[in-house]
Amino acid sequence: MDSHERVAQLFHDSIRAKQDALDRIAPDIVRAGRAMARALGADRKILICGNGGSAADAQHFSSELLNRFEMERPGLPAIALTTDSSTLTSVANDYHYDEVFGRQIRALGHEGDILLAISTSGGSGNIVAAQQAAAERGMITVALSGRDGGTLAETLSAEDIEIRVPSETTARIQEVHLLVIHCLCDLIDRTLFGGPGG
């Protein structure tokens, strides 16, 4: 397989991953979008966390809400818990890396807020701890996961929402996660500010 064929294969794999996910996760995306819009409409906020590429996704989602997505509208309250290196390193140093998001959630989260927890495996200790901290604060968790959902899926309550990408490949899961994030932004905007499908 030459380089062009490899690139074409990766495109086809990504398209297939999205097609395979559509029917399985579309209802969960709609449910999550409605929950987020309801929370934001009630002057609540969304806290977001993830590791590595999922940390970048957390910041991407936060920026789309704080600034704008595809329509002009006021900024919406969203905080990526992945951006403050002083806080992350002090918590990791003084306590444990598993607590880097949980301690922030206990300080910033309130009942009615939403946690968007992003993990391709669902097995990251700090993401599981974040979900547990959110539950303690009376928050709903929306979990973006993949594979079998991992420990994160096992800790979710009936009020929480899991959007699990049916793939075993990290890159494909991440690609679907990005599309899910854009779907959530679109649903939030249309629910709160109108437009087709709102």
Curated annotation (Swiss-Prot):
The keyword Zinc applies. Pathway: Carbohydrate biosynthesis; D-glycero-D-manno-heptose 7-phosphate biosynthesis; D-glycero-alpha-D-manno-heptose 7-phosphate and D-glycero-beta-D-manno-heptose 7-phosphate from sedoheptulose 7-phosphate: step 1/1. Substrate binds at residues 51-53, 64, 93-94, 119-121, 124, 174. Zn(2+) binds at residues 60, 64, 174, 182. InterPro entries: GmhA/DiaA (IPR035461), Phosphoheptose_Isoase (IPR004515), SIS_dom (IPR001347), SIS_dom_sf (IPR046348), SIS_GmhA/DiaA_subfam (IPR050099). One of its GO terms (molecular function) is carbohydrate derivative binding. PROSITE patterns: SIS. Disulfide bonds: none annotated. One of its GO terms (biological process) is carbohydrate metabolic process. Residues 36-198 form the SIS domain. Homotetramer. It is found in: Cytoplasm. Its cofactor is Zn(2+). NCBIfam families: PRK13936.1. It comes from Halorhodospira halophila (strain DSM 244 / SL1). The reaction produces a racemic mixture of D-glycero-alpha-D-manno-heptose 7-phosphate and D-glycero-beta-D-manno-heptose 7-phosphate. This is Phosphoheptose isomerase. The lineage of its organism: Bacteria, Pseudomonadati, Pseudomonadota, Gammaproteobacteria, Chromatiales. It catalyses: 2 D-sedoheptulose 7-phosphate = D-glycero-alpha-D-manno-heptose 7-phosphate + D-glycero-beta-D-manno-heptose 7-phosphate. PANTHER family: DNAA INITIATOR-ASSOCIATING PROTEIN DIAA, SEDOHEPTULOSE 7-PHOSPHATE ISOMERASE / DNAA INITIATOR-ASSOCIATING FACTOR FOR REPLICATION INITIATION. Binds 1 zinc ion per subunit.
